[in-house]
């Protein structure tokens, strides 16, 4: 009864939670990957925006922006051409989940990926991003050719 009352007066509210596919993911160069991301418990509009960034192993503290559902100028220069060419994109699925697609995976795509949902909530409460690791592997045929 007390919880219902507190909820009615706005004291108790849903807590935003962003979740991604658990990693690490292991993929070979040239493959197509998809990484799932979802937000729940948001107080804003039913359709949320998503932004994907990567933290590269060579500079793990530096965020490199990849793609966004709300800002076409979001990607850093190293990703702009692939985003505009449709090689990297976000697919919305029913409801709030989205899929980050990277076609023709490159060695430089390995790193820690972060899915972020900009706040649409009245109060900043909960998790607004989640991270996972992608480990790139060379194709076996490429490795064998170099050894020969």
PLM regions: where:
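N-terminal Sec-dependent signal peptide, specifically the hydrophobic helical h-region
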Residues: 1-25
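Short edge beta-strand/loop segments characteristic of extracellular beta-sandwich folds
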Residues: 34-40
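N-terminal V-set
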Residues: 42-84
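Extracellular/luminal immunoglobulin-like beta-sandwich modules
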Residues: 44, 48-49, 106-108, 112-140
């Amino acid at each position: 009864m007390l919880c219902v009352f507190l909820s009615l007066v706005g004291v108790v509210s849903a807590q935003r939670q962003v979740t991604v596919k658990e990693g690490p993911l292991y993929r070979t160069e040239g493959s197509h990957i998809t990484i799932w991301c979802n937000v729940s418990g948001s107080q804003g509009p039913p359709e949320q925006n998503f932004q994907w960034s990567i933290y590269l192993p060579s500079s793990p503290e530096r965020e490199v922006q990849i793609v966004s559902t709300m800002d076409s100028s979001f990607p850093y220069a190293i990703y702009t051409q692939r985003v505009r060419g449709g090689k990297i994109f976000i697919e919305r699925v029913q409801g709030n989940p989205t899929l980050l697609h990277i076609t023709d995976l490159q060695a430089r795509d390995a790193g820690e990926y972060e899915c972020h949902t900009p706040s649409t909530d009245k109060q900043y409460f909960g998790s607004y991003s989640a991270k996972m690791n992608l480990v790139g592997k060379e194709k076996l045929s490429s490795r064998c050719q170099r050894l020969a």
